Structure formats: C-alpha cells, structure tokens
Amino acid sequence: MASRGGGGGGDGNSPPPSVSSPDVRPSSPLPATNSSPPQSGRRGGGRRRRGSASPYPSSPSLGGFETPPHPGRRTPSGGAAARQQRQNWTGGRFPPTPSTPMSTDDVPLSSEAGDEDTPETDGGGGGGAGADATPVFVWGTNISVQDVNAAILRFLRHFRDPRDAGRVDPVMDEGKYMRAIHRILELEGGESLDVNAHDVFDHDPDLYGKMVRYPLEVLAIFDIVLMDLVARIEPLFEKHIQTRIYNLKSSVCLRNLNPSDIEKMVSIKGMIIRCSSVIPELKEAVFRCLVCGFYSEPVMVDRGRVTEPHICQKEQCKATNSMTLVHNRCRFADKQIIKLQETPDEIPEGGTPHTVSVLMHDKLVDAGKPGDRVEITGIYRAMSIRVGPTQRTVKSIFKTYIDCLHIKKTDKSRLHVEDSMETDNPNANKTTEDDFLRDKVEKLKELSKLPDIYDRLTRSLAPNIWELDDVKRGLLCQLFGGNALRLPSGASFRGDINILLVGDPGTSKSQLLQYMHKLSPRGIYTSGRGSSAVGLTAYVTKDPETGETVLESGALVLSDKGVCCIDEFDKMSDNARSMLHEVMEQQTVSIAKAGIIASLNARTSVLACANPTESRYNPRLSVIDNIHLPPTLLSRFDLIYLILDKADEQTDRRLAKHIVSLHFENPNIEELEVLDLPTLVAYISYARKHIQPQLSDEAAEELTRGYVEMRKRGNSPGSRKKVITATARQIESLIRLSEALARMRFSEMVEVQDVVEAFRLLEVAMQQSATDHATGTIDMDLIMTGISASERQRRDNLVAATRNLVMEKMQLGGPSVRMIELLEEIRKQSSMEVHLHDLRGALGTLMTEGAVVIHGDSVKRV
C-alpha cells in the first residue's frame, strides 16, 4: 500500500506513512476538513452527494471559503480501476498536493484470492508496501484504514438477518447484503445499496461508532469495498453502486442540532415544506483554446473551484490565457435544495417550528415532495459566508445544512404504499420486509371479509366520542374516498369528499377533526381565524439563498391527496373563503402574481367545522343564516352535518356515564371490538392505494332510480310549489359515497347495498341541514340559495298583496302613507303573520320596479 506523506519533497516511491498521535484529536468542524486532500486530478463515477460544492449556487471559480470544506470523493468503478488509480498516484501521474495529509480514498482493497476477510495491501506502481506495511490512519484520528476495511468486508459478507434464523432455505445461507448485491446485479438496475444502521450496530458496534463520527471517511471505504465485491462477482458490471445508510439508532430533533454534530452523521424527522427546482452542478469542466481550438482534458471541480488552464497544452500553440469553458462538453450532476420543517408534534409549548436546508443529489432528487413527512439520514455540514461577493473575508457565523444520504417517508403503519423512497428501479432495493408486509396485507384482507367490518370501522373511528354514528360513517367515507374520473375529452370529476360539521359548542367537532388529521395519509390542520387566503393556497416569496421569486405552498396544496382540516370555518375572512371555491370543485389553485402564472394541484378533501353565529344553533333559521356562509361555497360540500346539543335527561345521563368511564377503569363495562390506530391507518391506506371500485349495472340502475325518486318528492301532484330536493351535485356525491363504501369491503365492484347506504347517509345529512321547517320537507334551495321554496312563495305573496294595497289605497302622485298604516292594512287582509321587516322587503322590491318611493318611514306612489 503506497501512502502519501505531507511533505512536498519526496521521491514518491516510499513516503513516510501518516501515524496518529497517542492523544486522538477531536473532529472539529473546520480541522476535520484536512482529512481529505483536494484530489484535483481524479476521475470516475463518484460519491457526489458527500462532496457537494454548496447548497447555495455560486460560481465555481470563487474561493474555497464559499463552499463546504470537503472535496468530492470519486471512487472508481471496480477493483482494477482502483489499482490503476493508485499506480497513477504513486507513479507521479497525479502528484500529491504538498503539505496535505493522506486521503482516506487510498484504501487497500481486499484480496482477490479466496474468501479471506482480512484484506491484503496492493503493492502497485513503484514503491508499494507488502503485507507487513505500516498501518494507515485517518488524519487526526486513531481509525485504522485496514481495520475499517476488514470490518466492512466482514459485515457485507456475513451479516444475516435474525428473522431468517429459523428458515430452512439455502438462499438464506448467504448474507443479507450479499443477497442484495446479487439482486442488484441480476436486475441490472439500482445504483445504491441501502444499509440499515441497526444491522451495522448489531454486527460491529465499533464500526457503527466510527461511521457516525467520521461518515465521510468510513463511507468512502464502504464504497470501495462494495465495488471490490461487485468486481469479483461481475467483472463486467460498469455502474457505480453507492452505499446509503439509513435507520440510525437515535434520531435528533431539528432544534437539538448543535455545533458538536457538524461533520457527523445524523438522522432527523420533519415535513418537507419546499423543494427547489433541479440545479445542474458542474463536476467536470472542459476548456477550448481560442487560438488553435484545442480541447483540454476534463478538469475536476475541487470544492467549488475550477482550475482553468493558463497555457494551452498543444505543443504548437502554448498560448497563455486563451482557454474558455465549453459548456456542452462539461459534465453536470443533479442537485436540489429542500426545506425541512419540524412536525407539529415535536414543537414545544410556545415554540415556533425550526427549519433546515437539505441538499439532495442524483437519484435523491425529487424523492420527496412538499407535505411529505420524512426521515432523512445525512451529514450535518457548515459553510462559511463571505462578507461581500468580491471579498475573501468571511463572517464568524456559518450557514448549516444537511448533505442527504438517504430519505424515507415515515408513517410505517401505512404499509409503505407511499412511503418508500422513489427510485428508478424500486425492485432493486427490496429486502426481506416484503414478507412482513405480505403477512400484514393478508391480515387486512381477512378483516375486510368480516360481516360487521362496516360497524367495526365506525366504532374504531374516535372511540372516545360517544354516539354520532352517522357522522362517523360519513367521515369514514371521506377517509376512503372515491375514484377520480378523467374523461378523454379532458373533463374530470373529483373523487374526494368534502364534509362540513355545524353545531353547538362542546359537541366534539374539533376532536373529530383532530382524530381525522391523525388518520389521514397526509394533510394539514389549520384554523380559520388564523388563516389567510395565500396561507391556504400559495404565496410568492423571495428565495433566501438564490434571491429568486418562488412559490411557497399553502395548507391546501400541502394536503394534496390527503385531508385538509379547517377549524373555525365560520370565522374565516371572506377573501380566504373565496379561494376555496376552485379548490373544492376543480381541485386546483391558480396563481397569477409577481410574474408567476401557475396552476397547482390541490386534490384534497376538505373537512371543516363551524359554530353558529349566535353560539347556539337557531332551528328557525337556515344553515346559511346560522353560520353566514355563501351558498355557492356551501353547495360544494357533499355532506353537511348538524351536531346539536339538545336537552334530554336519558341522553344526558348516558353521555355523562360515557365521559366519566374514560377517566377510570370499570370492569363491568363490556367493550366492543375495535381496530387499533395503526391497523385502522393501514387498512385505510391499503384500500386507497389498491382498491379501485367500479359501478356494477345493478348499482347504476339503483343510482338512477333513487335520484329520480328524490327529484319527485319536490314535485308532488296537486302542489303549486316546485321544490328542488336534489341536484346534479347530489348524484355525484352519491357515486363518491358508494365507491368509498365499496372500498371499506375491499370490493372492486360497487354493489346495490353500497348505493342504498349512500342514499341513507345523504338523506340523514340533508334532513338535518336542508329541511324546510315550515313544511318539514327537504329543500335543496336552502343550500343552493339560502331561501326555501316556501319562504320564497311567502315573499312573492306578500309583494303581490302590498302591490294591490298600494294600487287601491294610494293615489298616483298623492300624499305619502306611513309604513305602520300599510302593515296594519295587510294584517287585516292576510291570515299569515307579517312583520315590519317583511313589509320593508316587499316595498323594496316594489321600489326597484318603480312603483313606489320610500322616504324614511313613509311610502309614496309614483
């Protein structure tokens, strides 16, 4: 093994090795950068994500102070290439940087002969050492490169999953990660090997500690050992495979990250709130001479700096300062910056959420989207900030960010249906967890075959809330949802169900919202009093890193394909409420401001709750009059439930017993079977992902017949009033409810029983919210316009009676008459009760027709 010394004056054949001192120096944020030299002459497929230039775009020609300190580690794609690379180093082809300690990339590869776990050093390229070479240490530490190499090799070859211990299968005799490597080679896909950090700890705790404390050095050795194994198994395999570590033993809260974590591997959980566009990052630069047109050899980017050749390398030219960058011959890598924010359950009392920038590279780009709750494993880094763009002086305060190694979506209870990291070939990273997931799916399918699964799901939804069974059934339908339909003509029909809860204070509305927020696959909980229009949809802001104008997603956009819970819906501003019209029907958010014209997806179900304006619901008034919501918005809700607090001795006693029983254990109470929260979430998630029910012929006939029957109720023979009891939006709601009920049974077909139950749920909601109290019948005009058909008829009759009275009693151009006198005359002629405000409304209608003129309390015919 040829190691590189720190001096610049050796012959290169046998430089002195770097030996650690007895007292190990700690890896501080900046001195740790000396553990890896620039390596400006190296080429090949490398670990770009660990040697990124900076998360903040800057010119590569800027100084090293503007970029993160560690260089890009570019490991060769095979054992032979690694030996050739070391020969190039020791042979003088790429001379070492003076006064720079040894690079940890100079790692001895394991022996190619036999299955020995102890690696042998290569003696290549003029001056290599033999088997008794002096141990090589990572600069500033007591980590022996040979020991780490051997430990990693033993781990990859021999680690076996404890769950495979009892299985009699010849395939399981091979190590877990050797099987994963073979799978990658067989599928010829996947450029990464996911390594569970728990497995590393179980196999070798010392290796785990070194990997967490010195991730750059240890992971570079990991990659070289991995590619050496790949080269033995498949010598012709050309792709470079990287190691991605995940699932550390401890996860750090965002607000607990401190300077002692810099340059260490950390695991954090949070929610993605913003993703930047994909940024091309220069990795290899090619220059062309402006005098002779000669193209230079590719120049590697070293810590954000591009070393431009000063002299043309062509013997016949040798022109100075004539080289220019050729962009279309350079090599770029994908880079993306995401903003990670603390989840609400991790924010302490009275605190505000903390955020951190995360740098994604290559295959990790677009692995997460805004609104996802993720766990990120990466290296906590610090970057200096210049005082000015043209000055090399830097500030004493550094910017911190995380260099991402692995990303996965959290919520294990959702069976990974939306939680696995997006890759080009997801089959390449499958492990033995597939068997575990298959067992859980079988259990869920057995649950779906139970005859009482509908009632059991209803009892499992918010079991601490007493009764409200029909409300819970409607909320269950919202969680399961219907099928979104898109026709070839471009027309689309939403599959999400919107529900509004209206009721008296203290009727568990907010608790239902909180429980739904826990169950929804993704979503945001917000309050109407503290929400603005742009906070709900999207707003334009300046990117703090690039200074560009960017769109920040609001609550509805972050809840895409989930449930957005809005509390205190009645207290929202009119401007904020008006933004919901497009979201609730077209499920998009259109933005046209600050030069940005965009349409964002907001395919979310809206669950809102509102209190009456007078604190108590007034049954004599309509829903619109009680909560002062515009009819155009109210009609977009599929189900509107009234939850009223009515005084009843028997009901009050049962409710009190239920609430008291929650605070102590009573062995005499018989508990009904319910599903626990993880099982319920998994059940809902699997149904939404894999069950796509279609309408059967019988169900379609029942839908048509039931809708026509509902319309007939408002057109009873002999009645002069034509009441609208159903609209086209109701039949769309019925289809969505029927599909959701079929999903609860894991059925691919919507049956007649689903349609019948959907009609019952809709009628229960309509009887509460759309019943005309004057006639006792359902009148959809209450929802569509806020005025029932009977009320409209009464107003028309009053206008006609007032017009006749004015024509009879008042002369054209004669003296005016007081309103009180008109009111008394109308009361004498009419049997119905008439109030002064009713008369004012009728006279206002006549004034718009030009029949009368109103002056204060006097009326004059014109």
UniProtKB/Swiss-Prot annotation:
<dbReference type="GO" id="GO:1902975">
    <property type="term" value="P:mitotic DNA replication initiation"/>
</dbReference>
<dbReference type="GO" id="GO:0000347">
    <property type="term" value="C:THO complex"/>
</dbReference>
<dbReference type="InterPro" id="IPR027925">
    <property type="entry name" value="MCM_N"/>
</dbReference>
<feature type="domain" description="MCM">
    <location>
        <begin position="453"/>
        <end position="659"/>
    </location>
</feature>
<protein>
    <recommendedName>
        <fullName>DNA replication licensing factor MCM4</fullName>
        <ecNumber>3.6.4.12</ecNumber>
    </recommendedName>
</protein>
<comment type="function">
    <text>Probable component of the MCM2-7 complex (MCM complex) that may function as a DNA helicase and which is essential to undergo a single round of replication initiation and elongation per cell cycle in eukaryotic cells.</text>
</comment>
<dbReference type="GO" id="GO:0000785">
    <property type="term" value="C:chromatin"/>
</dbReference>
<dbReference type="InterPro" id="IPR012340">
    <property type="entry name" value="NA-bd_OB-fold"/>
</dbReference>
<dbReference type="InterPro" id="IPR041562">
    <property type="entry name" value="MCM_lid"/>
</dbReference>
<dbReference type="GO" id="GO:0042555">
    <property type="term" value="C:MCM complex"/>
</dbReference>
<feature type="binding site">
    <location>
        <begin position="503"/>
        <end position="510"/>
    </location>
    <ligand>
        <name>ATP</name>
    </ligand>
</feature>
<feature type="compositionally biased region" description="Low complexity">
    <location>
        <begin position="20"/>
        <end position="41"/>
    </location>
</feature>
<keyword id="KW-0862">Zinc</keyword>
<comment type="subunit">
    <text>Component of the minichromosome maintenance (MCM) complex, a heterotetramer composed of MCM2, MCM3, MCM4, MCM5, MCM6 and MCM7.</text>
</comment>
<feature type="compositionally biased region" description="Low complexity">
    <location>
        <begin position="52"/>
        <end position="64"/>
    </location>
</feature>
<dbReference type="InterPro" id="IPR027417">
    <property type="entry name" value="P-loop_NTPase"/>
</dbReference>
<dbReference type="GO" id="GO:0005524">
    <property type="term" value="F:ATP binding"/>
</dbReference>
<comment type="similarity">
    <text>Belongs to the MCM family.</text>
</comment>
<keyword id="KW-0863">Zinc-finger</keyword>
<keyword id="KW-0235">DNA replication</keyword>
<dbReference type="GO" id="GO:0003678">
    <property type="term" value="F:DNA helicase activity"/>
</dbReference>
<dbReference type="InterPro" id="IPR033762">
    <property type="entry name" value="MCM_OB"/>
</dbReference>
<keyword id="KW-0479">Metal-binding</keyword>
<keyword id="KW-0378">Hydrolase</keyword>
<dbReference type="Pfam" id="PF17855">
    <property type="entry name" value="MCM_lid"/>
</dbReference>
<keyword id="KW-0238">DNA-binding</keyword>
<keyword id="KW-0539">Nucleus</keyword>
<dbReference type="GO" id="GO:0006271">
    <property type="term" value="P:DNA strand elongation involved in DNA replication"/>
</dbReference>
<dbReference type="Pfam" id="PF17207">
    <property type="entry name" value="MCM_OB"/>
</dbReference>
<feature type="short sequence motif" description="Arginine finger">
    <location>
        <begin position="635"/>
        <end position="638"/>
    </location>
</feature>
<keyword id="KW-0547">Nucleotide-binding</keyword>
<dbReference type="Pfam" id="PF21128">
    <property type="entry name" value="MCM4_WHD"/>
</dbReference>
<dbReference type="Pfam" id="PF00493">
    <property type="entry name" value="MCM"/>
</dbReference>
<dbReference type="GO" id="GO:0000727">
    <property type="term" value="P:double-strand break repair via break-induced replication"/>
</dbReference>
<dbReference type="InterPro" id="IPR008047">
    <property type="entry name" value="MCM_4"/>
</dbReference>
<dbReference type="Pfam" id="PF14551">
    <property type="entry name" value="MCM_N"/>
</dbReference>
<dbReference type="InterPro" id="IPR018525">
    <property type="entry name" value="MCM_CS"/>
</dbReference>
<dbReference type="GO" id="GO:0006260">
    <property type="term" value="P:DNA replication"/>
</dbReference>
<keyword id="KW-0347">Helicase</keyword>
<dbReference type="InterPro" id="IPR003593">
    <property type="entry name" value="AAA+_ATPase"/>
</dbReference>
<feature type="region of interest" description="Disordered">
    <location>
        <begin position="1"/>
        <end position="132"/>
    </location>
</feature>
<dbReference type="InterPro" id="IPR031327">
    <property type="entry name" value="MCM"/>
</dbReference>
